[in-house]
UniProtKB/Swiss-Prot annotation:
Residue ranges of coiled coil: none
Function per UniProt: Associates with the organic matrix of calcified cartilage.
Keywords recorded for this protein, A-Z: Chondrogenesis, Developmental protein, Differentiation, Disulfide bond, Gamma-carboxyglutamic acid, Osteogenesis, Phosphoprotein, Secreted
Family: Belongs to the osteocalcin/matrix Gla protein family.
Biased composition annotated in UniProt, kind: Basic and acidic residues: 30-45
GO biological process per UniProt: cartilage development; cell differentiation; ossification
Domain Gla: 27-73
Sequence positions bearing Phosphoserine: 2-3, 5
Protein name: Matrix Gla protein
Gene Ontology MF annotations: calcium ion binding
PTM annotation, UniProt: Requires vitamin K-dependent gamma-carboxylation for its function.
Modified residues (4-carboxyglutamate): 43, 47, 50-51
Tissues of expression: Accounts for 35-40% of the total protein in the acid demineralization extract of calcified cartilage.
Organism of derivation: Galeorhinus galeus (Tope shark)
Amino acid sequence: DSSESNEIEDVLFLGRQDANSFMRQPRPPNHWDSRDRFKSPRERTREKCEEYRPCERLARQVGLKRAYGKYFGNRRQRPSTSGRLRPRKYRASRYRNHHYRY
């Protein structure tokens, strides 16, 4: 009985090479496939605006670029009150010698 159970386990187990041989068939690269996999930034922008109803309505009136900018534009998020940044004049400068003239 124990020898039969070992045979079944051997049949069910596939090595990594054997599994990859039938799971992924090699094919030549096709530039049309990459268009389906990766969306352009404009397409991602359009989809994000379509999902938010006010942005979609405004996009019909003034255009996608302006509508997206109004609702999802580059707005700085406010830091949390617990980790407030010091005022700019007291922050460490990235370029410490910026005040010297050469």
